[in-house]
């Protein structure tokens, strides 16, 4: 049997497009989460939405690993563009992910004792995503993502752009990557841009 894939979204609207793809779907509840399990083509999968923010995403990721026995997690949803070259409706796929609101030594001097603040995307999942992006004909970018507990705007956006040079920002990806790293589980985040740095700048002008 092929490895079981976990699909984790922040909101029910982000999860909704995946549910019709699940054949022989079953539904159960755990930790106040609704878990959908079935098969996408011949691949076993479990899908859920966590609710917004880092802790909710981390809880959901651990449930997927412990209860659903997934062997990889894909975090899917929306994000805000940070790099000025990013446009609304572009898709961004994470090559690496970090928190923009956590002190660096929290991750390097304490558990999980990382070499840097960046959680890398899984190479095999990235190779599959690269091929899918080429086949899609849609605007897809690969690069850094950052995660924090609040929406960014104005000076906050500029500070994050200068410090981390990400393509986009969200409120869950790094937390899911963190849990996957601690459990030795492959991870990838795929985000569609719903707001861009250029649009935010225009609104402030």
Region locations from a protein language model:
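Active-site-proximal beta-strand elements of phosphoester/diester hydrolases
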Residues: 45-51, 142-146, 190
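Regulatory input/activation interfaces that engage signals or partners
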Residues: 187, 193-205
């Amino acid at each position: 049997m092929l490895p079981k894939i976990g699909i984790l979204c922040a909101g029910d609207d982000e999860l909704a497009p995946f549910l019709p793809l699940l054949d022989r779907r079953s539904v159960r509840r755990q930790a106040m989460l609704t878990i959908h399990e079935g098969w996408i083509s011949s691949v076993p999968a479990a899908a859920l939405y966590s609710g917004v923010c880092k802790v909710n995403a981390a809880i959901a990721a651990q449930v997927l690993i412990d209860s659903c026995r997934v062997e990889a997690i894909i975090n899917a949803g929306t994000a805000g563009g940070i790099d000025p070259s990013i446009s609304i409706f572009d898709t961004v796929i994470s090559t690496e992910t970090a928190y923009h609101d956590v002190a660096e030594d929290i991750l390097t001097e304490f558990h999980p004792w990382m070499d840097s603040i960046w959680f890398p995307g899984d190479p095999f999942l990235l190779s599959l995503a690269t091929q899918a992006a080429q086949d899609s004909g849609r605007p897809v970018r690969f690069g850094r993502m950052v995660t924090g507990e609040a929406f960014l705007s104005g000076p906050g956006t500029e500070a994050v752009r200068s410090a981390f040079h990400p393509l986009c920002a969200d409120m869950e990806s790094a937390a899911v990557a963190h849990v996957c790293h601690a459990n030795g589980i492959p991870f990838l985040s795929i985000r569609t841009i719903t707001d861009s740095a250029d649009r935010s700048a225009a609104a402030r002008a």
